[in-house]
Each structure stands twice: as C-alpha cells, then as structure tokens.
C-alpha cells in the first residue's frame, strides 16, 4: 500500500476526496451494501429501506467529510461520510458495493478517516453500529475500535444513538457507540 497526502492506494483501489461528480453514483453503492442485511431476519427491512440522498452526499462533500474508494477506472465502489463532533470525528456512513466487499476497501476508508482525525487534532474517531451484526461491531473491533460503556458515551454521540432509535426505527439494545483513540 502506498500513501500520499491526499490518496491511499492499494492495488487497483484508490481512496480520494469525493468529488461532486461522484455524488449521483453513491446511493447505488449504499443500496448494494445494504443488501447484506437481507440475510438477517430481524434487520431485513434495512435492505429494503431508503439510502442517503444525492443532496445529503453533496452536503458532506461540501464540508470535506466524504471520501470514496475508486477502482482503476476511477469509478466509485465504496464511500465513507464523516462529520465533526465536539470530541471526535464521527463516521456517519461506510458503504462498499457488494461486488467489492471483502477486499479491504472498508479498512482503507476507515484508515483515511483515522489519518484525517490525527491531522485535524481529534482525539478519537467514533461511530454507532449494531452490536450483533458480524460486519458491524465485531468488524470495527478488529480495526481497533472499542464499544463505549453507556456511562462513557459523550452527549453528542448519545444524541445520535437516541435519534437512531426515535427516527431510524432501531432497537436501542441492538445499537452501540464505538471509539478509536487516535
């Protein structure tokens, strides 16, 4: 793997800042990635639900909190969306197209966020996810994230978890907040 200031490369995959022209291709990637949930009885509804709008992607792109993994044809195959919280850089969404999963692309995207967090002097990278889904909390734990005990969840992160339950339809006990110390 080679690293430059703005890009991470691994074989035929490059991680770069998302461009405006990429935005229309990203909902299809999220839809494809979400199909994995169709294999889980209790979460099948996620594979049938909506995805981030092009407008939402554009807002994250405008805030420079959005990176894509592109193939050798410069076509997006995965993305990661982040936003700054008072205490951390928060991963809002990570999606890799089904055809490109299990190739280390998610790991590369997360590494880009970890690098950006360090450069911008964040103490940590955080996210919210499912505790029991193999490609969620257990995956992030393999990448160095730890599940935060409820008593240690910062207010801004707790608000996100609460919103996921209230508006997102998630069951509170299935969700967790995770943190990677930069």
Where in the sequence are the language-model features?
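A short beta-loop-alpha structural element at the N-terminal edge
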Residues: 14-28
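Conserved GNAT acetyl-CoA-binding A-motif
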Residues: 117-129
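A short, internal acetyl-CoA/4′-phosphopantetheine-binding micro-motif in the GNAT/acyltransferase core
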Residues: 94-101, 129-131
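Conserved beta-strand-loop-alpha-helix junction that forms the acyl-donor binding cleft
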Residues: 127-136, 153-158
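Conserved GNAT-fold acetyl-CoA-binding loop/helix
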Residues: 31-57
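Conserved beta-strand in the GNAT
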Residues: 68, 75-83, 90-95
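Conserved acetyl-CoA-binding loop-helix of GNAT-fold acetyltransferases
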Residues: 96, 102-115, 142
């Amino acid at each position: 793997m080679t690293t430059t200031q703005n890009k991470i490369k691994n074989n035929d995959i490059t991680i770069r800042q998302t461009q405006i022209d990429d935005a229309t291709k990203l909902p299809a990637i999220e839809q494809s990635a979400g199909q994995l949930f169709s294999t889980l009885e209790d979460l099948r509804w996620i594979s049938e639900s909506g995805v981030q709008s092009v407008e939402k992607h554009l807002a994250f792109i405008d805030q420079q909190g959005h990176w894509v993994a592109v193939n050798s044809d410069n076509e997006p195959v995965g993305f990661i969306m982040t936003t700054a919280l008072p205490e951390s850089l928060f991963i809002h969404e990570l999606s890799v197209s089904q055809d490109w999963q299990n190739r280390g692309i998610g790991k590369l995207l997360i590494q880009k966020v970890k690098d950006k967090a360090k450069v911008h002097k964040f103490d940590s990278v955080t996210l919210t996810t499912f505790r029991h889904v193999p490609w969620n909390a257990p995956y992030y734990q393999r990448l160095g994230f730890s599940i935060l005990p409820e008593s240690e969840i910062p207010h801004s992160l707790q608000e996100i978890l609460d919103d996921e339950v209230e508006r997102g339809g998630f069951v509170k006990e299935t969700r967790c907040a995770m943190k990677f110390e930069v």
